[in-house]
């Protein structure tokens, strides 16, 4: 259904392809021409610079006074150990700061699994290597401070504020709080009916495992929306003198589900759930429909395909539904 030339298309499809637990592709379409880059660049910047997370900020290693030194029996120098600790993926519940301890002796690798912590802390990648001990008599003991923050804060930004109270041997670490390790977006061509000048936004991202990629996208979009809220009221400053009245709902939403010509099984399942109009159906989610007795994935796929052919989808939000014309029936 083609709207006015002055109206903006709203994305009707959000597809999330979970490549792995830390890697996902998110596709958003259709978008007006140019909006692919507008939204893609904004989300990319937020995901890289503004996502909250936890990171190592300070380390104390027994027998080490400064970062430009080495430790007997340890293969890596202290700078390399600090670099490895920066890659530690930690999830902390209910606290802004925790102290972790690590004690290891004997030949072999020292990994994140050797860190001692309480129940509020989860080491996401326990196989992450911190250093290697090269002697049977070698040992390493350290205390690791993990803090919650946002973005990237270099150690140099904290040196001057903490210089007076920082004891010798406490090593500051550049803190990269963002759980997003890689983010890239691509804008492809999309088509709706006769329009071929539309955008499709494809975002590919990887996280460190402390946050699900889908949740990261959701948080970034929320941050962007909250920042733009200050401008929302400005849109009502100018009101057109004459405004053509439009129907409150798309007429297709007011039609009965029988018009979708679903199979008898699918139609009966919907009626059993008191889903009589297409407007009732599009507000349901996939999860809700799968809970319907006798409605399986095959029927769900059929419903999604039929809705998509009409430019609709599940999970839509309809304000003031049902309309008075239906509610009175």
UniProtKB/Swiss-Prot annotation:
Gene Ontology process terms (BP): DNA-templated transcription
Alphabetical UniProt keywords: DNA-directed RNA polymerase, Nucleotidyltransferase, Transcription, Transferase
Location of the region described as Alpha N-terminal domain (alpha-NTD) in the Swiss-Prot/TrEMBL record: 1-235
GO MF, one example: DNA binding
CDD domains per the UniProt record, alphabetical: RNAP_alpha_NTD
SUPFAM superfamilies linked: C-terminal domain of RNA polymerase alpha subunit, Insert subdomain of RNA polymerase alpha subunit, RBP11-like subunits of RNA polymerase
EC number: 2.7.7.6
Pfam families linked to this entry: RNA_pol_A_bac, RNA_pol_A_CTD, RNA_pol_L
Catalytic activity: RNA(n) + a ribonucleoside 5'-triphosphate = RNA(n+1) + diphosphate
Alpha C-terminal domain (alpha-CTD): region residues: 249-329
A GO cellular component entry from the record: cytoplasm
Entry keyword annotation includes S-adenosyl-L-methionine: no
Family: Belongs to the RNA polymerase alpha chain family.
Subunit structure: Homodimer. The RNAP catalytic core consists of 2 alpha, 1 beta, 1 beta' and 1 omega subunit. When a sigma factor is associated with the core the holoenzyme is formed, which can initiate transcription.
Protein task: DNA-dependent RNA polymerase catalyzes the transcription of DNA into RNA using the four ribonucleoside triphosphates as substrates.
NCBIfam families per the UniProt record, alphabetical: PRK05182.1-2, PRK05182.2-5, rpoA
Record comment regarding domains: The N-terminal domain is essential for RNAP assembly and basal transcription, whereas the C-terminal domain is involved in interaction with transcriptional regulators and with upstream promoter elements.
Entry protein name: DNA-directed RNA polymerase subunit alpha
């Amino acid at each position: 259904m083609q709207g006015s030339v002055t109206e903006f298309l709203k994305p009707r499809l959000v597809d999330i392809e979970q490549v792995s637990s830390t890697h996902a592709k998110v596709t958003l379409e259709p978008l007006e021409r140019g909006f692919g880059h507008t939204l893609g660049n904004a989300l990319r910047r937020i995901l890289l610079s503004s996502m909250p997370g936890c990171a190592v900020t300070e380390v104390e290693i027994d027998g080490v006074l400064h970062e430009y030194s080495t430790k007997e029996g340890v293969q890596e120098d202290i700078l390399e150990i600090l670099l490895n600790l920066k890659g530690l993926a930690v999830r902390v519940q209910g606290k802004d700061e925790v102290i972790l301890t690590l004690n290891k002796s004997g030949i072999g690798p020292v990994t994140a699994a050797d860190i001692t912590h309480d129940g509020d802390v989860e080491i996401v990648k326990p196989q992450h290597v911190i250093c290697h001990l090269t002697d049977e008599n070698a040992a390493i003991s350290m205390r690791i401070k993990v803090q919650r923050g946002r973005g990237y804060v270099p150690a140099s930004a904290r040196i001057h504020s903490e210089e007076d109270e920082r004891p010798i041997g406490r090593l500051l670490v550049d803190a990269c709080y963002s759980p997003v390790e890689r983010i890239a977006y691509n804008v492809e061509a999309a088509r709706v009916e006769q329009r071929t000048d539309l955008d499709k936004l494809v975002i590919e991202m990887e996280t460190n495992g402390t946050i699900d990629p889908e949740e990261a996208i959701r948080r970034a979009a929320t941050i962007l929306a909250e920042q733009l809220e200050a401008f929302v009221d400005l849109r009502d400053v100018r009101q057109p003198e004459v405004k053509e009245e439009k129907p409150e709902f798309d007429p297709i939403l007011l039609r009965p589900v029988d018009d979708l010509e679903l199979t008898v099984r699918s139609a009966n399942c919907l009626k059993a759930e008191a889903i009589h109009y297409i407007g009732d159906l599009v507000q349901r989610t996939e999860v809700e429909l799968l809970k319907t007795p006798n409605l399986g994935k095959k029927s769900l796929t059929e419903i999604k395909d039929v809705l998509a052919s009409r430019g609709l989808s599940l999970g839509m939000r309809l304000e003031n539904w049902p309309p008075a014309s239906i509610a009175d029936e």
